C-alpha cells in the first residue's frame, strides 16, 4: 500500500523571524475569526430583534361556542382584522383547540362561551330596565408550554383585537338601546358600560410549574445535550489522538509525543465513537441528577435520559466524523452547524413564526431545533409524539446515520488511498535537522580534539 508523501519544505532557521512579518501571517487568523464572529453577531441579533415585524402564520385558536349571532360577528371580525400573512387564526371546536394547545401547535386561544349573545342582550336591556345583570365575557388563554415569548405575543394580539371588537360591539349595542328607548338619554354609567360591554378575562392554559425557568428549562437542557455531544467530541478527539501519539500532548511547559500506535484512521474514528457512546450514557444521567437536585420538574425521567443519550450520541458521532474527515477545519464546521446556526433557529426563546424566513428554513434540519422539540415534549407536553417528539426522534436518527456514513466512508477511503496518519513531514524534517546539527557538533569536537592531539605530538619533537 502506498505511503503518503511529505508535502512540506524542510524548516529554514533563517525564516523564523521573517515568517511573522508577512501579511498572510497576521491576516489569516484575523480574517477567519472576524468572519466567524460577524456571522455569530448577525445571526443571533437578526433572529431576535424584531419578532413582531417578522411574524408569519403565527397560530392562534378561536373557539366560538356562542349559540347566537354575536359570537360569530366577533369571530369574523377577528379573522378579517388580523393580517393573514402574519397570523394563522384557526376557528376550531373546544376539543380541537385543546389538542392544539397540548401539542404546542397554538400559542393561545380565545373562547367565546355559549351564552355570550344572550348575556349581551340582557346587559343591553339592563341599561334601561332596573335589575341586576352581568357583563358578557370572553376568555383569552395563553400557552407558555409552547413558548414564553410566543404566549406573550398571542396574549397581546388577542387583547388588542378584543379591544377593537369590544368597541364595535359597544357601538352596535348603544345604537340598539337608543332605538328601543326612542333616543332617550342614558345615565353616564349606563353609556360607559354600553360602550365597552365585554368583560375580557385573561388566563393561562395549563400553567408551567415552578422550577422551569418560566419555560426556558427545556431550551437550556437541550443546549446542554448539544454541547455534550459537540464539546465532548472535541475533547475526546484531542485526547485520543494524543494518547495514540499522533498529536503532541501539552501540559503546561511539557510538550511530548506519546509512543505512536499503529492504527488506521477508520479504527481511530471507531474508538472515538465508542468513547462518545459511553460518555453519552454517563452524561445524560449526570444531567438528570443535577437537574433533579436543583428542583427542575422531570415528569418522564427515564424517557428524557434515553433521548438525551440518543441526542448526545448523534451529535458527538457526527462532530467526531467531521473532525476526522476535515481535520482542524472540522472544528469550525461543527461549531457552525451545531452552535452558530443552531441556537438562533432553535425556536426556543423566540418562536420560529416570529423569526426571519432564513431561520425557519434552517429549523427544518438544524440539530438544535430537533433536540429542543424532543426535550420540550418530554418536559412540558407529556411526551406526546405529535408534540414534536416523533420529529425529534426521526431527524436525530437521520443525523446519526449521516455522521456514521460520512466518517466511516471517507476515513476508509483515506486509508485505502494511503493517506495514513504517519508522523508529518515537518516533524521528520525537524528531527533530521536536529540530527544534522548534532553530527556537525560531533564533527567539530572531533576536529578540535585531533588538532589538539597533533599540537601536543609536535611539541616534544620540537624540543628535541
Language-model-derived ranges and their functions:
Residues 172-185, 256-260, 281-293:
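Hydrophobic, membrane-facing alpha-helical anchors
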Residues 225-233, 403-407:
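Hydrophobic core segments of alpha-helical transmembrane domains
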Residues 2-211, 215, 413, 417-464:
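Extracytoplasmic/periplasmic domains immediately adjacent to an N-terminal transmembrane anchor
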Residues 272-278, 286-444:
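Membrane-spanning alpha-helical segments of multipass transporters and channels
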Residues 210-230:
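N-terminal membrane-entry
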Residues 19, 258-262, 297:
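Helix-boundary and loop/linker segments of multi-pass membrane transporters
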Residues 229-281:
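Juxtamembrane interface at the cytosolic side of transmembrane helices
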Amino acid at each position: 500500500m502506498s505511503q503518503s508523501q511529505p508535502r512540506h519544505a524542510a524548516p529554514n532557521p533563517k525564516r523564523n523571524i521573517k515568517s511573522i512579518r508577512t501579511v498572510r501571517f497576521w491576516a489569516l487568523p484575523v480574517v477567519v475569526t472576524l468572519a466567524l464572529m460577524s456571522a455569530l453577531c448577525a445571526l443571533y441579533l437578526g433572529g431576535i430583534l424584531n419578532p413582531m415585524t417578522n411574524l408569519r402564520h403565527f397560530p392562534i385558536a378561536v373557539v366560538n361556542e356562542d349559540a347566537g349571532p354575536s359570537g360569530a360577528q366577533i369571530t369574523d371580525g377577528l379573522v378579517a382584522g388580523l393580517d393573514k400573512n402574519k397570523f394563522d387564526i384557526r376557528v376550531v371546536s373546544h376539543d380541537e383547540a385543546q389538542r392544539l394547545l397540548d401539542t404546542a401547535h397554538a400559542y393561545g386561544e380565545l373562547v367565546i362561551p355559549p351564552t355570550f349573545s344572550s348575556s349581551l342582550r340582557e346587559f343591553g336591556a339592563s341599561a334601561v330596565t332596573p335589575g341586576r345583570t352581568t357583563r358578557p365575557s370572553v376568555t383569552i388563554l395563553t400557552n407558555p408550554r409552547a413558548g414564553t415569548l410566543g404566549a406573550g405575543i398571542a396574549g397581546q394580539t388577542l387583547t388588542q383585537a378584543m379591544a377593537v371588537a369590544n368597541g364595535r360591539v359597544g357601538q352596535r349595542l348603544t345604537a340598539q338601546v337608543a332605538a328601543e328607548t326612542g333616543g332617550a338619554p342614558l345615565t353616564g354609567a349606563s353609556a360607559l358600560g354600553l360602550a365597552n360591554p365585554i368583560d375580557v378575562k385573561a388566563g393561562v392554559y395549563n400553567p408551567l410549574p415552578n422550577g422551569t425557568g418560566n419555560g426556558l428549562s427545556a431550551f437550556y437542557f437541550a443546549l446542554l445535550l448539544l454541547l455534550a455531544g459537540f464539546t465532548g467530541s472535541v475533547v475526546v478527539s484531542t485526547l485520543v489522538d494524543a494518547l495514540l501519539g499522533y498529536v503532541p500532548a501539552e501540559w503546561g511547559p511539557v510538550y511530548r509525543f506519546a509512543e505512536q500506535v499503529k492504527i488506521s484512521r477508520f479504527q481511530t474514528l471507531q474508538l472515538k465513537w465508542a468513547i462518545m457512546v459511553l460518555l453519552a450514557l454517563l452524561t445524560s444521567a449526570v444531567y438528570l441528577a443535577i437537574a433533579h437536585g436543583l428542583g427542575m420538574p422531570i415528569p418522564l425521567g427515564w424517557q428524557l435520559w434515553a433521548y438525551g443519550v440518543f441526542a448526545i450520541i448523534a451529535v458527538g458521532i457526527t462532530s467526531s466524523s467531521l473532525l476526522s474527515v476535515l481535520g482542524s477545519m472540522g472544528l469550525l464546521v461543527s461549531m457552525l452547524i451545531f452552535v452558530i446556526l443552531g441556537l438562533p433557529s432553535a425556536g426556543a426563546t423566540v418562536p420560529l413564526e416570529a423569526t426571519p424566513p432564513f431561520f425557519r428554513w434552517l429549523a427544518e434540519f438544524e440539530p438544535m431545533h430537533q433536540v429542543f422539540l424532543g426535550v420540550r415534549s418530554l418536559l412540558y407536553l407529556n411526551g406526546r409524539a405529535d408534540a414534536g417528539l416523533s420529529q425529534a426522534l426521526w431527524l436525530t436518527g437521520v443525523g446519526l446515520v449521516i455522521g456514521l456514513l460520512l466518517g466511516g466512508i471517507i476515513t476508509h477511503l483515506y486509508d485505502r488511498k494511503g493517506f495514513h496518519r504517519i508522523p508529518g513531514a515537518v516533524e521528520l524534517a525537524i528531527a533530521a535537522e536536529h540530527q544534522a546539527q548534532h553530527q556537525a557538533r560531533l564533527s567539530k569536537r572531533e576536529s578540535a580534539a585531533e588538532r589538539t592531539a597533533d599540537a601536543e605530538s609536535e611539541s616534544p619533537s620540537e624540543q628535541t
